[in-house]
A protein has these predicted regions:
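A charge-rich, low-complexity, intrinsically flexible signal that marks solvent-exposed coils, linkers
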Residues: 1-204
């Protein structure tokens, strides 16, 4: 795991995004989903693995409906500090636009296998403990492609059938339009409105 690609794309004198570092202990099992209104609105799904956030761009966002198979495109690893990043990436910078911490929490591997091994094998089975996403999920690589090959690395993000599954899931519902970190809407983040802290938020 490395942050070289992440750092090479960003001018940290211009963007408020964290430089971060690889944490060698690598024991944090946090996850974050960030709603990102850049050139196109999408959601970034990130899992703490080996001291960084393994990351995927999910164009339609995650779903709690097991019938939905969400495309997830692997992107560069991000620092663990990025899990708490919310704000505006300035125009002209990589990923310019609004970033919201849409969900945040912990995860546990479903199989008796470390997440880094599951990731290397192209099938990650986990249980999420977030505010919006809960229960079992599977990330599965669609083709034997590596980011090192220079081609896009396509995966599918699928909700497992359990007590948390919701066949009526609608990610655009007003129930899900606020940050779990600050309580702000995308519009309020863009306008730089102050956070609306509350008790019980997840810590990473």
């Amino acid at each position: 795991m490395s942050l070289a690609a992440y750092r090479s794309k960003r001018a940290f004198t211009e963007t408020p995004e964290p430089v971060g570092r690889v944490r060698r202990s690598g024991r944090t099992r946090a996850f974050v989903v960030q709603k990102h209104d850049a050139s196109r609105l999408h959601y970034d799904f990130r899992l703490a693995v080996n001291g960084v956030l393994a990351s995927w761009a999910v164009p339609k966002g995650p779903s709690m409906n097991p019938a939905d198979k969400r495309l997830a495109v692997r992107t560069e690893d991000h620092p663990l500090e990025y899990a708490k990043f919310e704000g505006m990436i300035p125009p002209g910078q990589y990923g310019a636009g609004i970033v919201m911490v849409w969900d945040l929490g912990k995860y546990e591997p479903l199989e008796n296998q470390p997440p880094e091994e599951q990731l290397a094998l192209g099938k990650v089975q986990i249980v999420l403990q977030g505010e919006k996403l809960r229960g079992g999920f599977t990330l599965i690589q669609t083709k034997n492609r590596s980011m090192n090959s220079g081609r896009r690395d396509y995966w599918l993000l699928i909700k497992r059938r359990d007590e948390y599954a919701d066949p009526l899931w609608d990610i655009d519902s007003a129930r899900f339009d606020r940050s779990v970190l600050t309580g702000r809407s995308m519009k309020e983040i863009k306008e730089g409105k102050p956070a609306k802290p509350r008790l019980g938020r997840h810590r990473v």
